[in-house]
């Protein structure tokens, strides 16, 4: 028997895509006990779309949050935590964070729940994502123990042990949760047999991409990234996007010179650096030529052993079913 689960979706101005996400969840063979969609000051019609579906399904709830005067990347954690307050007293065994711009097949969550049943040491699971350009993480580099923040499914004990999502203005709250889970002895794993489609294209303008690269460099320093690992990341990015790699390195150096405050405990920094050096050692021993090719975070999806990603089939077509049950 599969464990029961709840979902929380922080959403801000997701009217363009959130209906695809709702239809994907409604079509699941195993539905959540509760799904709280937290509208974080949305003004584009997101709320009205959610209300339409929630009116016929008691397990879907819209939670509206007022618009905050200060906008930063901690907003996702604040919105998630508001939703968490609505479900934490319920009976469930798994809790998931789900972005509001995804679509996936009807067995997506039953598949992940099954993986948690198979291995009691797994605390966090997920799948790869791809966007319309068929790009995803290069797991030859980041490793299959990395779980994208687009959809993270936690065993309840794991989520409570790590203290949930900690708001950090620089962002990366899902990454902090991932590292903390491993530090506390839980396994984390991405399973490439399935995938989800990430509909929103991030940083489509070149200046947006460069700004994101610089910010990622700042975040790498703030989260205690080892200088040698960062050097590898910069070189790796430059193979696909030279300017992106340069801006990544510039962000790291800028943060180091400015001594940007590190918002995570020292033990997490130390643990993260040990992991990075272990991974870098494996990459070097395995041959650098095997992993150099595409960008670190936007590698061609052929690096993932998933025929859906390689051929652009199935879930990547984002073809939601036409009829969905109302219960």
Give names to the regions the model predicted.
Residues 103-138:
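Conserved donor NDP-sugar-binding/catalytic core segment of glycosyltransferases
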Residues 211-306, 317:
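Non-catalytic, C-terminal membrane-associated alpha-helical segments of glycosyltransferases
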């Amino acid at each position: 028997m599969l464990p029961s689960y709840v979902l929380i979706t922080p959403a801000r101005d997701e009217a363009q895509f959130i209906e695809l996400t709702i239809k994907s969840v409604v079509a699941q063979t195993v539905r959540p006990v509760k799904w709280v969609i937290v509208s974080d000051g949305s003004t584009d019609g997101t709320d009205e779309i959610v209300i339409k579906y929630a009116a016929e399904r008691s397990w879907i709830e819209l939670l509206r949050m007022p618009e905050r005067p200060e906008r930063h990347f901690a907003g996702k954690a604040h919105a998630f935590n508001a939703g968490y307050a609505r479900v934490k007293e319920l009976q469930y065994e798994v809790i998931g964070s789900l972005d509001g711009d995804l679509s996936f097949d009807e067995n997506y969550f039953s598949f992940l729940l099954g993986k948690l049943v198979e291995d009691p040491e797994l605390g966090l699971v997920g799948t790869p994502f791809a966007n319309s350009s068929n790009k995803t993480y290069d797991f030859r580099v980041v490793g299959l123990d990395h779980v994208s923040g687009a959809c993270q499914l936690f065993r309840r004990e794991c989520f409570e042990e790590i203290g949930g999502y900690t708001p950090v203005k620089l962002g990366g709250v899902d990454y902090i949760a991932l590292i903390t889970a491993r530090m506390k002895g839980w396994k984390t794993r991405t399973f490439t047999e399935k995938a989800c489609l990430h509909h929103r294209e991030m940083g489509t303008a070149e200046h947006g991409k460069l700004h994101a690269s610089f910010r990622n460099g700042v975040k790498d320093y703030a989260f205690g990234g080892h200088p040698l690992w960062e050097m590898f990341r910069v070189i790796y990015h430059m193979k696909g996007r030279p300017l992106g790699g340069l801006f990544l390195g510039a962000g790291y150096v800028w943060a180091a010179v400015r001594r940007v405050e590190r918002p995570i405990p020292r033990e997490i920094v130390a643990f993260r650096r040990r992991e990075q050096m272990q991974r870098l050692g494996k990459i070097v021993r395995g041959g650098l030529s095997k992993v150099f090719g595409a960008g670190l975070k936007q590698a061609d999806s052929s690096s993932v052993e998933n025929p859906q990603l390689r051929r652009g089939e199935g879930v990547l077509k984002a073809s939601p079913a036409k009829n969905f049950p109302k219960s």
